[in-house]
Amino acid sequence: MFTLKKPLLLIVLLGIISLSLCEQERNADEDEESEIKRGIFPKIIGKGIKTGIVNGIKSLVKGVGMKVFKAGLSNIGNTGCNEDEC
């Protein structure tokens, strides 16, 4: 009985080791695929998104800037009090 336990234990250990190595190799392959996908996304789509965001911010700043400028011009002579009060 004892002589059967050693080879069985050896087979189980070798099986566990081989499964572990296969899993590590599979994980490495999945990491490479995800890196490739991440590398493609910013190059193709990222440029369009960046351009859209920058253009949107520029137009927003221009619109808000003009409103602030116009509001400032209308308030230049206005001190905030009536002529009778000051």
Swiss-Prot record:
Q: Which residues form a coiled coil?
A: none
* Record's signal peptide: 1-22
Q: What is its main location?
A: secreted
InterPro entries in alphabetical order: Frog_antimicrobial_propeptide
Q: Which cysteines are joined by disulfide bonds?
A: 81-86
GO CC, sorted alphabetically, is:
extracellular region
Q: Which residues form the propeptide?
A: 23-36
Keyword check for Iron-sulfur: no
What are the GO BP annotations of this UniProt entry? defense response to Gram-negative bacterium; defense response to Gram-positive bacterium
Localization per record? Secreted
Keywords from the UniProt entry: Amphibian defense peptide, Antibiotic, Antimicrobial, Cleavage on pair of basic residues, Disulfide bond, Secreted, Signal
Q: In which tissues is it expressed?
A: Expressed by the skin glands.
Record flagged with keyword Aminoacyl-tRNA synthetase:
no
Q: What is stated as this protein's family in its record?
A: Belongs to the frog skin active peptide (FSAP) family. Brevinin subfamily.
Functional description taken from the UniProt entry:
Antimicrobial peptide.
Q: What is this protein called?
A: Palustrin-3b
Which species expresses this protein natively? Odorrana versabilis (Chinese bamboo leaf odorous frog)
